[in-house]
């Protein structure tokens, strides 16, 4: 590794040509980090949403090991998760290649443990990642999808490709708080529950497991885990729980890092940081003290490999997308609040020189085009942007920012390369702009369907005709508001 970093092509001077960051600043930042008593690295999607995102994370881990910034308070390599419980979802095996506790499906011992407990057979080969699902759906080999709490039709890159995949499937089930863009393709829509109605745990980026308690019962009458149990039962499965604490007990039984976790302990003692087991009965505030699980740390070679997405004569600008403080992700929740006063629409930020060259002024409608799609946004001319780079957000479905982003992704994780898309910007609206608004008749049908499901769930759970009547009145208001 030392030989690798000493190569001339890996020097700050060589990298300056690729990044535009002066070599002197890179050296100064490196010395500041290396000489700090405690140096902590925090990173977000600006690092990972590149074709070489995983390589960059490995590079940061190399820096932390080389400078001794691991295994004690105030140091480490710390990902800033996009929202609460991303860590918890990963811990529970929300990957196509791992079971709970980050154990690979190819491990026969681990797989058989889960098979014996669940009474099912688990494939030893990894499943599909989301982009692979879309490709397989278009090819006709992927037939159905169950989407919970995610709007893939708005958030995933290359919207036209995603919509084609959704249309190709025989069954699309969407479970969410709101009728989002993906719900336009749903054969079945199931109402979801908010965090105020959930009973369970959230785990944050420091591996801290916190209890989450409901402030109210779900308006639909059932928790999401109960709905999943009903679906499993209808499909011939045996998934059954009477309380979410039983789910945590199963997690503790099957996952060594959670072996000592229970609702009873969390309610009595407060939050806990995994691993919590016989070796660490009170939890583990700091990991990697003195050594790693594998022993000594392993330095990874991290060669620079340029993205395949490059500016060209036809697409001379580079688009990067991101978020803004007042809106959250695809805006399914925040667009329904007064936050729209601060961010009523997605705009395209463009450098004054690039705007002048194209005859564009602030407030003008502009066409944003890439090799995969075209959309229309309003321009914001600002020297905040670097010349040659444009920026927009993706909070509003009408702007369809992901219509133009491509299928390029990280080499290891398939995380989309949202930060680099070659585009052209021209004045005026595009005739090819994708229409992403819900057709009124389709939206009304979905509203009626969702309310019918909610009424049935409420009746099944409580037998209360008053609740069903209240939902009928709400259904009328909802349909009127969307007509």
Regions found by a protein language model. Name each.
Residues 178-213:
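Flexible glycine/proline-rich, aromatic-decorated loop/lid segments
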Residues 1-36:
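Long, well-ordered, tryptophan-enriched scaffold segments
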């Amino acid at each position: 590794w030392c030989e690798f970093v000493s190569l001339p092509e890996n020097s700050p001077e060589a990298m300056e040509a690729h990044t535009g960051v002066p070599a002197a600043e890179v050296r100064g930042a490196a010395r500041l980090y290396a000489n700090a008593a405690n140096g902590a690295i925090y990173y977000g999607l600006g690092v990972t949403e590149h074709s070489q995102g995983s390589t960059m994370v490995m590079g940061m881990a190399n820096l932390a090991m080389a400078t001794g910034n691991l295994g004690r308070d105030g140091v480490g390599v710390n990902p800033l998760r996009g929202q609460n419980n991303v860590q918890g979802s990963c811990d529970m095996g929300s990957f196509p290649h791992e079971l709970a506790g980050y154990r690979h499906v190819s491990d026969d011992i681990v797989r058989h443990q889960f098979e014996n407990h669940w009474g099912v057979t688990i494939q030893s080969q990894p499943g599909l990642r989301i982009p692979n699902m879309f490709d397989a759906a278009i090819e006709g080999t992927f037939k159905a999808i169950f989407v919970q709490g995610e709007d893939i039709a708005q958030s995933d890159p290359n919207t036209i490709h995603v919509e084609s995949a959704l249309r190709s499937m025989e069954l699309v089930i969407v479970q969410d708080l709101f009728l989002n863009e993906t719900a336009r393709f749903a054969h079945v829509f199931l109402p979801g529950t908010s965090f105020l109605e959930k009973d369970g745990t959230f785990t944050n980026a420091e591996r801290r497991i916190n209890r989450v308690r409901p402030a109210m019962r779900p308006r639909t009458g059932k928790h999401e885990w109960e709905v999943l149990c009903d679906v499993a039962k209808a499909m011939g499965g045996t998934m059954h729980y009477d309380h979410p604490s039983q789910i945590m007990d199963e997690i503790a039984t099957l996952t060594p890092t959670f072996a000592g976790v229970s609702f009873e302990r969390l309610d009595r003692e407060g939050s806990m940081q995994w691993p919590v087991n016989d070796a660490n009965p009170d939890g583990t505030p700091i990991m990697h003290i003195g050594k790693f699980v594998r022993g000594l740390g392993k330095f990874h070679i991290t060669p620079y490999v340029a993205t395949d997405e490059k500016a060209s004569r036809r697409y001379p600008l580079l688009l990067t997308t991101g978020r803004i403080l007042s809106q959250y992700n695809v805006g399914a929740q925040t667009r329904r609040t007064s936050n729209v006063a601060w961010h009523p629409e997605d705009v395209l930020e463009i450098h004054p020189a690039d705007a002048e060259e194209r005859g564009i002024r602030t407030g003008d409608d502009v066409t944003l085009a890439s090799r995969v799609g075209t959309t229309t946004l309003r321009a914001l001319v600002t020297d905040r942007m670097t010349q040659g780079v444009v920026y927009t957000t993706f909070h509003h479905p009408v702007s369809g920012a992901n219509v133009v982003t491509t299928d390029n992704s990280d080499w290891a994780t398939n995380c989309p390369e949202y930060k680099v898309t070659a585009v052209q910007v021209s004045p005026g609206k595009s005739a090819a702009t994708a229409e992403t608004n819900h057709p009124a008749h389709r939206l009304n049908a979905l509203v009626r369907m969702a309310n019918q499901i909610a009424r049935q769930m409420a009746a099944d759970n409580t037998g209360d005709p008053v609740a069903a009547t209240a939902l009928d009145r709400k259904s009328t208001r909802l349909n009127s508001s969307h007509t």
